[in-house]
């Protein structure tokens, strides 16, 4: 399972004109399930996303997780957006292959599981809409972007 996380000042996701998720300071996570991924892999990836220290402490070092973005216990937002293209095989030719991605029904199930688990562990969770054509807007903070991957 893959998450591309970006530290943001703010971010939102829309389907058409409808805002489906919006956060202030926090993390935008583009999330992808790969073939063979399990709920255990989703749990492991979520622990990594929630614990990854990408926010600056008082000394200016990236030392704080999304649950404590200011060092005083204030949680940041977590915007979760499904993006199967993260699993693309780009090793040959000029057209990506999406064979490594989980089939749509399994991808949806694992994304929904990931969202539910995130909501159980973090106070501010917003989402996109699985399988929809979405428009994602964000103001990167840094920029700070990390590729997190957990193998099943």
From Swiss-Prot:
UniProt record, GO biological process: D-amino acid catabolic process
SUPFAM superfamilies named in the record: DTD-like (SSF69500)
EC number annotated for this UniProt entry: 3.1.1.96
Motif window: Gly-cisPro motif, important for rejection of L-amino acids: 142-143
One term of GO molecular function: tRNA binding
EC category: hydrolase
Pfam families according to UniProt: Tyr_Deacylase
Biological role stated in the UniProt entry: An aminoacyl-tRNA editing enzyme that deacylates mischarged D-aminoacyl-tRNAs. Also deacylates mischarged glycyl-tRNA(Ala), protecting cells against glycine mischarging by AlaRS. Acts via tRNA-based rather than protein-based catalysis; rejects L-amino acids rather than detecting D-amino acids in the active site. By recycling D-aminoacyl-tRNA to D-amino acids and free tRNA molecules, this enzyme counteracts the toxicity associated with the formation of D-aminoacyl-tRNA entities in vivo and helps enforce protein L-homochirality.
Record remark on domains: A Gly-cisPro motif from one monomer fits into the active site of the other monomer to allow specific chiral rejection of L-amino acids.
Family: Belongs to the DTD family.
Designated name of the protein: D-aminoacyl-tRNA deacylase
Organism per entry: Burkholderia multivorans (strain ATCC 17616 / 249)
Top-level taxonomy: Bacteria, Pseudomonadati, Pseudomonadota, Betaproteobacteria, Burkholderiales
Record gene name: dtd
């Amino acid at each position: 399972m893959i998450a591309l996380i970006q530290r943001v000042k703010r971010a939102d996701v829309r389907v058409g004109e409808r805002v489906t998720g919006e956060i202030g300071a926090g993390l935008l996570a583009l999330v992808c399930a790969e073939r063979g991924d399990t709920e255990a892999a989703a749990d492991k990836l979520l622990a990594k996303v929630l614990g990854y220290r990408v926010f600056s402490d008082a000394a200016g070092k990236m030392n704080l997780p999304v649950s404590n973005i200011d060092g005083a216990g204030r949680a940041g937002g977590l915007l979760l957006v499904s993006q199967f293209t993260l699993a693309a095989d780009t090793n040959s030719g000029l057209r990506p292959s999406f064979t490594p991605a989980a089939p749509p029904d399994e991808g949806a199930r694992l994304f929904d599981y990931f969202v539910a688990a995130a909501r159980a562990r973090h106070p501010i969770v917003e989402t996109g809409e699985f399988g929809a054509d979405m428009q994602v807007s964000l103001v990167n903070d840094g920029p700070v972007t990390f590729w997190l991957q957990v193998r099943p």
